[in-house]
């Protein structure tokens, strides 16, 4: 998967398919908050995503407070959003919904 920065049009199209994800205020990242029933579910989600992110060699910027996980994705060496970010966002959506 490429680490080439996506165009604004490509990011907009991807966000339309990603549901609750949005462009961060910096314009170079995408973000989403995931809210779970409790801390255990939030932590299980983070563990599952961490294992997938490690395999992808692409790691989220995230934080967890009780049952909420806030995520920001970008590819630092590309200076913006890449296909890797979109792929990880899709994986996170899948883990959250399934």
UniProtKB/Swiss-Prot annotation:
Keyword Lyase: yes
Keywords assigned: Lyase
EC number in record: 4.2.1.96
Catalytic activity: (4aS,6R)-4a-hydroxy-L-erythro-5,6,7,8-tetrahydrobiopterin = (6R)-L-erythro-6,7-dihydrobiopterin + H2O
Alphabetical list of NCBIfam families matching this protein: PRK00823.1-2, PRK00823.1-3
Glycosyltransferase keyword on record: no
InterPro entries named among the record's database cross-references: PCD_sf, Pterin_deHydtase
GO biological process, one term: tetrahydrobiopterin biosynthetic process
Superkingdom, taxonomy of origin: Bacteria
Family indicated by similarity: Belongs to the pterin-4-alpha-carbinolamine dehydratase family.
Lineage: Bacteria, Pseudomonadati, Pseudomonadota, Alphaproteobacteria, Hyphomicrobiales
Gene Ontology MF: a single term: 4-alpha-hydroxytetrahydrobiopterin dehydratase activity
Name of the protein: Putative pterin-4-alpha-carbinolamine dehydratase
């Amino acid at each position: 998967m490429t680490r080439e920065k996506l165009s604004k049009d490509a990011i907009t199209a991807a966000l339309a398919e990603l549901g609750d994800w949005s462009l961060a205020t910096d314009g170079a990242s995408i973000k989403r908050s995931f809210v779970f029933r409790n801390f255990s579910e939030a932590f299980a989600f983070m563990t599952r995503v961490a294992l997938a992110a490690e395999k992808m060699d692409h790691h989220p910027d995230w934080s967890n407070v009780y049952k909420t996980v806030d995520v920001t994705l970008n590819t630092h060496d590309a200076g913006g959003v890449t296909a890797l970010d979109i792929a990880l966002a899709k994986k996170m959506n899948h883990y959250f919904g399934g």
